[in-house]
């Protein structure tokens, strides 16, 4: 069975008992979470979120990239969120490479020119959280005077550690 077939089978089971079709579009807890796409992270579980509680925006590293800012602006302006939580994590792949490394790999394997792309890797986990919190707080596209907090999720213990 292919992955697509497995997903379709799982969705059939999910949809057969689905009863949340009337949830409102705006998240009930008025919060957006920006975190990493790493498969070891399950933000709904480790934050105690239910369906409809929050916007969860995921990308490589949980970075406050232009696209993440775009999503946060939509979340705030059109759907009423007024808090942002940034969560990076231990043992993140973004700590393992430099832009030059990935650009070279893309050139060698795909003959793709990625010189213009910043993949946003980082060397210091806590500093990356601080940087992304600052990017969000300083973005002209996002609300001022709202709670923007940063955390590190420990993949070994499941604990959230605040970053100040």
Language model features by range: what are they?
Residues 1-28, 62-67, 74-79, 94-164:
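Divalent-metal-activated hydrolytic enzyme cores
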Residues 11, 33, 57, 86, ...:
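Divalent metal-coordination and catalytic microenvironments
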């Amino acid at each position: 069975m292919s992955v697509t077939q497995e997903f379709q089978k799982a969705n059939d089971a999910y949809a057969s008992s689905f009863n949340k079709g009337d949830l409102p579009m705006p998240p009930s807890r008025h919060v957006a979470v920006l975190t990493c796409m790493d498969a070891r992270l399950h933000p709904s579980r480790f934050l105690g979120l239910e369906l409809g509680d929050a916007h969860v925006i995921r990308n490589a590293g949980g970075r406050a990239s232009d696209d993440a800012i775009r999503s946060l602006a939509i979340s705030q302006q059109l759907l009423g969120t007024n808090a942002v939580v940034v969560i990076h994590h231990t043992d993140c792949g973004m700590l393992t490479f430099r832009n030059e490394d990935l650009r070279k790999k893309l050139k060698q394997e795909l003959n793709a020119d990625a010189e213009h792309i910043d993949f946003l890797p980082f060397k210091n986990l806590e500093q990356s959280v601080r940087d992304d919190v600052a990017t969000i707080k300083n973005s002209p596209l996002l609300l001022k005077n709202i709670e923007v907090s940063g955390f590190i999720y420990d993949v070994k213990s499941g604990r959230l550690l605040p970053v100040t």
